[in-house]
Structures are given as structure tokens and as C-alpha cells.
Amino acid sequence: MRVFIFIYIFIFSSFLSSDETKDPFENLNRKTFEFNENLDENFVMPVAEAYSKFPPKIKIGISNFFNNLEEVDTFVNQLLQGKPKQSINDLTRFVINTTVGLGGFIDVASKIGLERHEEDFGQTLAVWGVGQGPYIMLPVLGPSTLRDTLSRPVSSFLSVTFHMTETDVNIALKGIDAIETREKLLGIESLLSGDKYSFVKDAYIQSMLYEIKDGIDVQDDFIDDMDDFLID
């Protein structure tokens, strides 16, 4: 495992830049963004709008379920980032919510004071000093960076569903998760002005930095950047 980690960093750190605003593929990224927008407008958004009409308690339960599936990924990456205390917290959350919380549909752990964290292998690479590389807009999957794109196979391997379900069920779960996430963003478009591509890019980069730094020293910059795009 340690050899794998060393090779992974050695190969990719040689060409991943730490430049936070690099977008050398902007022309291609914008075309991909347009494709994603059309897909969203014609399929994802209508489904998300239908989902928004579900009873709040059901939506909360579904959100809790998918949050619980991410706990194992977070637990492993907390360990890789040298955060043993947080990793124990996250593993405990997973055990409690999976058992007492009926498969994760009820967030019992939060009710007893166990705070939820979100970590992935992309953040772990950042903590290890691997630069983010250029900004990339992925078809269907949306905004990313080269570092986060290369980290996806590891994150997929750490996914609970990767090991516990058939491929078609795994795909179905990912689809439901995407719709659940999209439903939370309904209405944001009406608050934006200017170049939506730039907004999405800046929002993604700022959110990524916020997660990497655990919210330290980036919140004010994030708010200032978002103000530039919001309609008065």
C-alpha cells in the first residue's frame, strides 16, 4: 500500500500544478459545460423538481442514507491525512447509523454529538502536497480538476456500494444520489448573473479549497467571490 501511494504521488505530482485558476482547456470545457447544461435542463432538473415534491422526512432520510455511504471513504482518507481522532469519529458514525439508524436513513450519530466530516482521496492528495492541476469540466459528472479526476478510481474503490452491490444497482444508487444533490440546488439559477461557466468554476474551486482546509481561512474569500455573481 505504501509503495502504491509513493508511485501515485511521484507520477502525478510531476505535472500537477498548484495554480488555483488554471483553465488551459477552457474552449473544450465550455462546450462540455453546454452539453451538461442541456442534459440538466432536459432530464436532470425535471426529475429533481419532481423529487422536490416528496415529503421532507423522506428526502431527509434519503440524504442521510447517502451521507452514511460516504463515511467509509471519509474514514480511510482521515487516516491517510493523519487525523486519527476524526477517523475514529467517522467510523463510529458509520457503525451507529448503519445499525441503530436503520441503514443510515436516521442520523443518530449527529444527535449524540458525533460531527459529520467529508473527505475524499482528492483532498488527501492535496494534503500530501499534490497540486490540483488544470480545471476540467467532465461530461455528465461536472466540474473537476486533474487531481480530482485522477483520484476518482480510488474514491470509487472506497465506496461501500462498489463492494456490496451489482453494477446496475450501483449505477441506480449513483443516479438517485445525483438527483438528491441536484434537488438541493434548485432555484440557484435565478439568483445568478453574468457568466455561469465562470461562476461554476469559481464556486467549485472555492468549495474544494474549503474542504481541503477544513473551512479555515477561505470562507470570507468564498463569500466575496460569490457576491460578484449574485443578482442584487
Residue ranges and their predicted role:
Residues 11-17:
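N-terminal signal peptide c-region/cleavage motif recognized by signal peptidases
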Residues 68, 75, 81-143:
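Mid-length scaffold segments of soluble, non-membrane domains
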Residues 20, 128-232:
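A structured, mid-to-C-terminal "fold-capping" secondary-structure block
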Residues 38, 42-46, 68-75:
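Amphipathic, well-ordered alpha-helical segments in soluble domains
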Residues 42-60, 122:
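Membrane interface segments of multi-pass transport proteins and intramembrane proteases
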Residues 20-34:
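Short N-terminal segments immediately surrounding and downstream of signal-peptide cleavage
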Residues 1-5:
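Positively charged n-region of N-terminal signal peptides that target proteins for export
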Residues 62-65:
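Beta-rich strand-turn-strand
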